[in-house]
Regions:
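Catalytic-core segments of class I nucleotidyltransferases/pyrophosphorylases
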Residues: 96-166, 172-175, 179-182
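Alpha-helical elements of Rossmann-like donor-binding domains used by nucleotide-donor carbohydrate transfer enzymes
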Residues: 35-36, 62-63, 146, 176
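Conserved core of the sugar-phosphate nucleotidyltransferase
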Residues: 5-9, 57-134
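Short beta-strand-to-loop acidic/aromatic patch adjacent to the donor-nucleotide binding site
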Residues: 44-55
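Conserved beta-strand termini and adjacent loop/short-helix elements that scaffold enzyme active sites
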Residues: 21-23, 77, 160-162
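Conserved N-terminal catalytic core of the sugar/cofactor nucleotidyltransferase
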Residues: 1-46
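Active-site glycine-centered loops adjacent to acidic/histidine catalytic or metal-binding residues
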Residues: 53, 80, 170
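Short, high-confidence coil segments that cap the C-terminus of an alpha-helix
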Residues: 44, 71-72, 155
Length: 182
């Protein structure tokens, strides 16, 4: 895809100076794939991950403003759903995430695949801990369960609820989106 779609020049127009990390083959999951960029993200800069199999109708500025609030270490964009194809978050009475689950509806708060970390180094630390503990789902290391490591360490994780989530990762989801989205 890198050469076929001229990704270097395309991404350079969208985000001048961006770094591109190419993947040679299949990894053991998205968390492993993200860590291929460890030398670029293991720092004190904010980090934002976005899955690529959804269409979102949202205000990214509102999300980032909410995530940058004092005392917040990490967060996620969420929507209401219960289908077990999503990741899910459970929150306490203060609105902080108490745990997340992959493909297990522990609540009706599903994650939209947009994940924020105030410091990239926190993500790297907790992703490596999760991998070291061999915490897998469907034999893969997913990104969302990394939050559980942070929560166990006392980090404050919050949600940002919205209504504009459209999954497009399967042919059925894409067809539904094309027929129903205006």
């Amino acid at each position: 895809h890198y050469e076929k779609y001229s990704l270097k020049s395309l991404l350079g127009v969208i985000s001048p100076g961006c770094e591109i990390v190419q993947v040679d083959g299949v990894t053991e999951g998205a968390a492993c794939t993200t860590l291929l960029a460890k030398d670029l993200i293991d720092n004190d800069d904010p980090l934002l991950f976005a899955n690529s199999d959804q269409f979102l109708d949202w205000d990214s500025n509102e999300f980032m403003y909410s995530m940058m609030a004092d005392g917040i270490d990490a967060g996620m964009l969420t929507f209401e759903a219960t289908h077990p194809k999503w990741s899910f978050a459970e929150i306490d009475e203060s609105g902080y995430v108490t745990r997340v689950a992959e493909k297990d509806p522990i609540s009706n708060i599903a994650t939209a695949g947009i994940y924020f970390w105030r410091r990239g180094s926190d993500y790297v630390k907790y992703a490596e801990e999760m991998i070291e503990k061999n915490i897998r789902f469907n034999n893969e290391f997913y990104v969302c369960p990394v939050f559980n490591q942070a929560i166990e360490d006392g980090k404050k994780v919050k949600i940002f609820q919205f209504d504009g989530m459209w999954g497009i990762g399967t042919p059925e989801d894409l067809n539904y989106f094309l027929k129903n989205h205006e």
